[in-house]
A protein has these predicted regions:
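C-terminal "closing" transmembrane helix and its immediate cytosolic amphipathic cap
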Residues: 466-471
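Charged substrate-recognition surface patches at the periphery of nucleic-acid/ligand-binding domains
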Residues: 429
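Sequence context surrounding c-type heme c attachment/ligation sites in exported
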Residues: 462
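Bacterial N-terminal signal peptides
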Residues: 7-21
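Positively charged n-region of N-terminal signal peptides that target proteins for export
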Residues: 1-5
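Formylglycine-dependent sulfatase
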Residues: 25-420, 424-425, 434-459, 473-484
Length: 484
């Protein structure tokens, strides 16, 4: 009889645990959350995602252990510093044209306890931020603790307009005299990893879960790394991208004239200059990968790995010589599409999901995992339904924009890019043309099928504009695409 009662009691306890609302879960049962955020890392700059030139063995191990979202995007930017908009959206959950852009607006968000870290803290999480912040509010206000907060980018004026063909290049990515990432005596990526490792060691034995916001400046320029990493990528062995151009013919219409990022390499672009920049890009990515490896080793050593959800992503991508561009202020996939990986307890290993998402979906996803309240005005979506194998019910398309110079919508394997200043429209079939080399609206390619797809994507873009608070009037600029 005693055995029967014991069995019934255990069954009742298990049923109670299953039916318990997420918000009432005990701290010990909720996962800790580790965000690994890169800067300027395109989806096509990771070995596990198809780039055979770059070595990213530690990042690759994460992709093998978790679920990859293959079509993850950033929504765009309201000025040249795309990272500011991306990180503001990430930390507030607001869409691009609704997000707080000014210090008073961000202070109001803080007062309303709407920041990502504040929501997790309210749910009992310990929060720490290290590395790049780039929001116009002191991160010490919104995290329990901050360490080595960095500015938007390491400053180094010697990196611009180089290399010049036929002339010696006086700049060296591994020489500390040029400052940048070397300012302070130790490479910033190593310092950020040191901070994360120290926090993890301090977390051993503590019952409250943590939210560790680890934001690397790398691989943002100046792309500096130690000599041994630079030596892995001799410039003359680095492949020139298949979509290389000396210049993009629409650069002025895109709002890119005299933009800082576009002055990193000489105009017109040369294969040699692009090889040099891409070699330095790969070197700092591999150095970043080594720092991520140190953090992962610490998770394993401390035993924290078994109850930690890891998200690896980037604030946006980067052109680095593709389409004649160097920066990220454009709507091509190399600049708006980023890697996105989530792994940890309960997450399927080795799975790939091709449903379109925004990187800022990380916020509501982790809040739901933590049993924390999701603010009602969050515009992004939890990925848990997709992770649980449910089919998407709402988002079928992605939109993007840059100031009032560019707009984009992608759906059904196609992408429509608009440059309203010159009434330019470009259409790409991403399934057949992933490098976006063949504009289907050019006179030689245009046909009724392509025109119909343009009109369909234009209607989708108008719908997403309304949803995301984008007030740019496109209908008057493109009456031929507008619905009747």
């Amino acid at each position: 009889m005693m055995r029967l009662w014991t069995t019934l009691w255990m069954c009742a306890a298990c049923l109670t645990a299953v039916l318990m609302p997420v918000g009432t879960l005990q701290a010990e049962s909720r996962p800790s959350i580790l965000l690994l955020l890169a800067d300027d890392l395109s989806y096509d700059a990771v070995h596990a995602l198809g780039n055979q030139e770059v070595r990213t063995s530690n990042i690759d191990s994460l992709f093998a252990q978790g679920t990859t979202f293959t079509h993850c995007y950033n929504m765009g930017g309201w000025n040249g510093a795309i990272c500011v908009a991306s990180r503001t959206m990430l930390n507030t959950g607001r869409a691009l044209w609704k997000a707080p852009q000014t210090k008073p607006q961000l202070e109001a968000e803080f007062a309303g306890k709407r920041f990502w870290s504040q929501s997790l803290k309210a749910a009992g999480y310990r929060t720490l931020m290290t590395g790049k912040w780039h929001l116009q509010i002191d991160p010490a206000k919104v995290f329990d603790e901050v360490r080595h907060v960095r500015q938007g980018m390491p400053h180094d004026s010697d990196q611009y307009n180089r290399p010049l063909d036929g002339q010696p290049d006086k700049w060296s990515p591994s020489d500390p005299k040029f400052g940048g990432y070397w300012t302070g005596g130790k490479h910033w990526s190593e310092v950020t990893a040191d901070d994360a490792i120290a926090f993890l060691d301090e977390s051993v034995g503590k019952t409250a879960p943590f939210f560790l916001y680890t934001a690397f400046n790398a691989p943002h320029d100046p792309r500096q790394s130690p000599t041994e990493f630079v030596a892995e990528y001799p410039a003359d062995r680095v492949r020139v991208p298949d979509n290389f151009l000396p210049d993009d013919p629409h650069r002025e219409a895109m709002g890119l004239i005299d933009l800082r990022d576009e002055n990193l390499a000489p105009h017109p672009r040369t294969p040699h200059a692009v090889q040099v920049h891409r070699s330095e890009y790969y070197a700092i990515i591999t150095h970043l990968d080594a720092q991520i490896g140190r953090i992962l080793e610490t998770l394993d050593r401390t035993g924290l790995r078994q109850n930690t959800v890891i998200i690896f992503t980037a604030d946006h991508g980067l052109a680095v010589g593709q389409h004649g561009l160097m920066g990220k202020q454009n709507q091509f996939d190399h600049s708006v599409r980023v890697p996105f990986l989530i792994c940890g307890p309960g997450i399927t290993a080795g799975r790939k999901i091709d449903s379109p998402i925004y990187l800022q979906d990380a916020m509501p996803t982790t809040l739901q995992l933590a049993g924390a309240a999701i603010p009602p005005d969050v515009d992004f979506q939890s990925l848990l339904p997709l992770l649980h194998g449910e089919k998407p019910t709402t988002r079928q398309a992605i939109s993007g924009g840059y100031i009032d110079f560019q707009r984009m919508a992608t759906a059904e394997g196609y992408k429509l890019i608009l440059y309203p200043k010159t009434k330019t429209a470009r259409l790409y079939h991403l399934t057949d043309d992933p490098l976006e080399q063949h504009d289907l609206l050019e006179s030689a390619a245009v046909n009724e099928e392509n025109r119909a797809m343009s009109r369909r994507l234009f209607r989708t873009l108008l719908d997403l504009q309304r949803e995301n608070g984008d007030n740019l009037n496109l209908t008057s600029v493109y009456p031929e695409l507008a619905p009747e």
